[in-house]
Amino acid sequence: MSKKPVRVAVTGAAGQIGYALLFRIASGEMLGKDQPVILQLLEIPDEKAQNALKGVIMELEDCAFPLLAGIEAHSDPLQAFKDTDYALLVGARPRGPGMERADLLAANAQIFTAQGKALNAVASRNVKVLVVGNPANTNAYIAMKSAPDLPAKNFTAMLRLDHNRAASQLAAKAGFKVGDIRKLTVWGNHSPTMYADYRFATVNGESVKAKINDQAWNKDVFLPTVGKRGAAIIAARGLSSAASAANAAIDHMRDWALGSGGEWVTMGVPSNGEYGIPAGIVFGFPVTTENGEYKIVEGLEIDAFSQECIDKTLAELQGEQDGVKHLL
C-alpha cells in the first residue's frame, strides 16, 4: 500500500542551498524511496525571488519525480507552513559589508520570530524543524521560543556539516574510508568555535585517537581546518558552501526521520542540562535517533582540553542568546 504524502516546507527555496536541496528531497533521498512528498516552498515577497522560485518549480516538474505529489510556492509563512510535517529553515539574512554581528542577530531575530510564530500557528504538532540559516543555533533558539505550543525538542540546528567535514579530515589524515568512522561528534555552536571531538571515534573497532595520536595536529590543524572550512570555501569559490550544506541537511533529516541505526550523529538540540550545558540552549551534541526521536549520548568523559573547548563555544552561544533576548 502506498504511503500518504508528507508535507515538507523549505524556506529560502530559490537560493543556492535550496536549489541543491529540493531535487534530492523530491527524489526520496531524505525521507525514503517509498515516501511521497508535497513541497511547500517559501521565498521573500520580492518579484525577482518569486520569479526565481517559479523557475525552480518548473525544473522540479520537468524531473517527473514519482514521489513528488505536489509543489506549492508561497511568500507567506502562514501558508508555507500549513500542516507541514518537516520544515527546513534555510533562508536567513546573510552578513553584508560593514554589518555588525548585533545587526545580523537582530535581522535574523525578526525572520525567525515570524517563522516560529507561523509554525506555532499552523504546522503539524509533530513538525520536525531543522534550522540551516546562520547563525543556526541562535536562529533555532529564536524560532523555538516563538513557538510555545510546539515541543522544544522539535527544533534543531544543523551541525551535520561540521560533523561531515570532521569525518572527511580524519579520513584524509589516517587513510580511513570516511564511511567507516563511528562515534565522532561535534559539540556546541555551528561556528569556528565548534569542537569536533574524535576521542571516542572508531574505525572497524579500532580507536581513531590511538591511530592518529597527535594532539598538536588536533589543536593546530584539525580543529581550525574544520572550524574555518566555510570561510576557505568562500575564499576559493567566491560563494558559500551550498551543495555540502544541502547534503548535511539531507543527512540530518534522514537520520532523524528514519533512524541512525544505533550510530552517533551530531545534531544541535535544546539542552536539558546534559554535560553542564544550561537548559534551553541549542547546542551540538552526540545523539542517536530512532522512531523519529533523538536521544543525547550521555555519560561521556570530558577531559580538561575538551571542557575548555566546550566552555568556549558555550560562551559564544550565550553571548548570541543574550544579544537577542530583548527581541523575543
Swiss-Prot record:
CDD domains: MDH_chloroplast-like. InterPro entries: L-lactate/malate_DH, Lactate/malate_DH_C, Lactate/malate_DH_N, Lactate_DH/Glyco_Ohase_4_C, Malate_DH_type2, NAD(P)-bd_dom_sf. The keyword Phosphoprotein does not apply. The active site is at 190 (proton acceptor). Disulfide bonds: none annotated. Pfam families: Ldh_1_C (PF02866), Ldh_1_N (PF00056). This is Malate dehydrogenase. It comes from Delftia acidovorans (strain DSM 14801 / SPH-1). The lineage of its organism: Bacteria, Pseudomonadati, Pseudomonadota, Betaproteobacteria, Burkholderiales.
